[in-house]
Amino acid sequence: MRPLAPLTRVALSTLLLALLLVGCAQNEPEFSVSDLPPGDPARGAEIFTEPPGGASCAHCHPLDGERSVGPPLTGYAARAAGEVSGQSAEEYTFDAILRPSKHVVRGYSNMMPGSYEDALTQQDIADLIAYLLSR
């Protein structure tokens, strides 16, 4: 087998690096907040504590205001409404669930899993948003 020419090695290395970066990038959701059905806050409360995928929101996001791994959700609706200029509380919450690295709360590291799009249905997401915005 002939050794690769230096230019070919550079091209292959560049291609492999590009593929690696694409594979590590956070995927954009295939739908937007405007595509979601109406949410049910009561069902959202159930998903918050015992989601279908098994990773409980409540484990890292306390409801009592205590500091934990993730920011507490006491008064969440008011904070979400003013967190990002030009973005509604629903859009902000949608991003927090499906694009968690987009807006990292000051004082916290982004330790949330990449996205819950594969674990939650659109109805689950709508219900969870409705619950969080009822707080």
Where are these regions (language model features)?
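Gly/Gly-Pro-rich "capping" loops immediately C-terminal to redox-active cysteine motifs
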Residues: 34, 38-41, 59-96, 114-118
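Bacterial N-terminal signal peptides that target proteins for export
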Residues: 2-12
